[in-house]
């Protein structure tokens, strides 16, 4: 049976979707059967894996609100399976207010296919609202990308408080699996200081492999492919391959 991970940080621009796309694809390259659930209305993980809007007949929105079986919405790609998102998801938080088990609709859907995958990632939106709450209730563990920049730790206390609340009241199995340091520039004292500070706050939980600031990482999404397929020799590709190996060993 596979393991469900929510990739979450309520701050935008921290490399959350970049990590979701490239870590999922790198684990797929290592032979794991992966499913990436794009639960962000911006749908950047969907487009980042080459799935165009016109190709999407059913999305995660249809699964959680229209009763579409999750298998009917999954798209098979060369980089692993994807449960695509769409802009319709932006209104889902309001529509879920009157739903039964509203915090668990995503979990209920994903449980139908959980045994078919080694790893399922949920790319949560950059907020701590209903969609992210669904991601946290569905997951067994969370992965938190943290950028090595000013205010990196800002807001993480809110995220960890939410994690504790969900664990206490809704999902007792939920754990912090690991923290991924992103946008790291080893040439600067500042990046190194931030990395040290994050490791101090999360002892034993920060992955040894860090993700550098890298032009190829920024360019790959516009081509609809993971960085390993865009430029396999880039520092970004090497970093995500090494992170995937570390991640797999920790499973």
Which role fits each region the language model picked out?
Residues 1-251:
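P-loop NTP-binding core
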